[in-house]
Regions:
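Flexible glycine/proline-enriched surface loops and loop-helix/loop-strand junctions
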Residues: 1, 75-78, 92-96, 115-124, ...
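A long, amphipathic alpha-helix that forms part
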Residues: 1-31, 41-43, 47-88, 368-370
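Short, solvent-exposed loop/turn and secondary-structure capping segments
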Residues: 19, 31, 43-57, 122-123, ...
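Loop/turn elements at helix/coil->beta-strand transitions in domains of secreted/extracellular proteins
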Residues: 27-33, 175-177, 192-195, 236-237
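Secretory-pathway/luminal and periplasmic proteins that interact with or process carbohydrate-rich
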Residues: 40-48, 170-177, 392-397
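Surface-exposed acidic, glycine/proline-enriched linker/cap segments
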Residues: 58-94, 286-289, 411-431
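C-terminal cap/loop subdomain of S1 sulfatases and analogous C-terminal strand-loop tails that border
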Residues: 77-107, 118-128, 133-220
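Extracellular glycan-associated modules
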Residues: 256-442
Length: 442
């Protein structure tokens, strides 16, 4: 919790720097600033917290002893930390539960709007009900801009939001938003004219029956904390709101409902511009390729090959890298030998070292080939990783590969360097450890 408080102080300081610049440049008075959180405090840290949230995305439970051993590293480069869900509950007080639930603990957020030259009141609170989708309509309304119905001949989707501008001008005006629909990982909610119906789907259980979920009812105009479930007293109101939820879900294309685990969600192929294929070619000196668009080597055999020219014994650096400290793999040259590392969810660096010096020459193929021969839960492929100079095997070892994404965001695929955080601590000077002493062709 202290780490997150420290980061918030850091964010506050840098927002202040932006405000100072706007003030100094004479733009502050006529600039609308909107500051909003993205959801309630998050409960993904589980009961014991986590020093490596990537475990959760890969279906691997945390170990409290490992967490305690890393206590002094929290907030540093060696951790991908998350607070325990008890802190999430505390952060959301007086609201209950946390992110991914439809209670106010998961959905109610602060929203600060500042526009000195256009608002008479300063530091005032507004109580109208609004949603994040209302921000863009508010800006357009403020600018007097009507969104186009078509762009370059393509019909645009409708805006779901309504402008909040009226609430800035009139604190006592009734809420312009009358209905708000919620759905996340199978849990559902609907707010309408001061009443809210909520049903909690068993968390990340996968494939449980939605018909078994029980709807609760709260009169949020007088019970913002949602403490008093009135479903038994007003069954007709529950039916009304549930029917409205289904209507809104249809209008918002929310079906089918999805209660898969994070690992299931992240390992299910999604539509992409380039269709999947058996062979991918990448080149050096290009931007990193995001993981969602790069070759997918999860839960399968694969080969990584680099076509290189090596004139002498000075070649060194990364040939290929994907991912980072909390999951990834890399093929690289060190001490004139070929090496491969597979960093399993940040838990273990599995290193395979070449046993022979690199040959010199042109159009050499240096490769690492993984042959899957087994699988451990949850979808962890096991097998033999072999290193080659051309057709000559120069090293091998048994590894296991990561079941889900290497990284939730960032740290894509690179050729000739390792961008961001290094996949391994075996690089002499850390990342990017660019390849030198030779030429990578592809």
């Amino acid at each position: 919790a202290e780490v997150y408080a420290g980061f918030l102080a850091h964010a506050d300081h840098n927002i202040g720097r932006l405000l100072d610049y706007l003030e100094e440049s004479g733009q502050r008075e006529n600039t609308m600033i909107v500051v909003v959180s993205d959801n309630g405090a998050s409960g993904e840290g589980g009961p014991d917290g986590s020093v490596n949230e990537n475990k959760m995305f890969n279906g691997i439970p945390d170990d409290i002893q490992e967490n305690l051993a890393m206590l002094d590293e929290l907030g540093g480069t060696k951790t991908y930390n998350h607070y325990p869900n008890g802190w999430a509950m505390a952060f959301n007080t007086p609201f209950k539960m946390w992110k991914r639930y439809e209670f106010n603990g998961g959905t109610a957020d602060p929203c600060i709007i500042s526009w000195p030259s256009a608002t008479a009141g300063h530091g005032e609170i507004r109580h109208q009900y609004h949603h994040a989708v209302d921000i863009v309509p508010t800006i357009l309304d403020t600018l007097g801009v009507e969104p186009p119905e078509t762009i370059k001949g393509h019909v645009q989707s409708r805006f779901d939001g309504v402008s909040m501008r009226y609430s800035v001008d009139d604190p006592s005006a009734p809420s312009a938003r009358k209905t708000q629909f919620y759905s996340m990982l199978g849990s559902r909610g609907i707010w309408h004219d001061g009443w809210k119906a909520i049903t909690t789907h068993p968390t990340l259980s996968g494939w449980s029956d939605f018909n078994d979920d029980t709807w609760e009812l709260y009169h949020t105009d007088v019970d913002r904390a949602e403490l008093h479930d009135l479903a038994a007293e007003h069954p007709e109101k529950v039916r009304e709101l549930v029917n409205l939820w289904f209507a809104e879900a249809g209008a918002n294309e929310a079906f089918p409902l999805d209660d898969r685990s994070p690992l299931e969600i992240f390992t299910t192929p999604r539509p992409q511009l380039a269709p999947p294929r058996d062979r991918y070619t990448y080149f050096p000196d290009t931007a990193e390729v995001p993981e969602a668009q790069a070759v997918n080597v999860r839960n399968r055999s694969f080969t990584i090959g680099a076509l290189v020219d090596i004139p002498g014994v000075d070649a060194s650096g990364v040939l290929f890298a994907q991912g980072a400290l909390f999951g990834g793999h890399a093929l690289y040259v060190k001490d004139n030998r070929l090496h491969y590392v597979n960093n399993f969810v940040g838990m273990a660096e599995q290193k395979i070292d070449g046993t022979q010096d690199l040959p010199a020459g042109e159009n050499l193929i240096l490769s690492a080939s993984f042959a899957k021969d087994g699988e451990d839960p949850p979808h962890v492929s096991t097998g033999i990783l072999s290193l080659y100079h051309g057709d000559k095997k120069v090293g091998e070892g048994r590894i296991k590969t990561q079941p889900g994404q290497f990284m939730f965001a960032g740290e894509g695929l690179c050729v000739g360097r390792d961008s961001g955080e290094a996949v391994t601590d075996d690089y002499p000077n850390g990342s990017p450890h660019r390849f030198t002493g030779g030429t990578i062709k592809r």
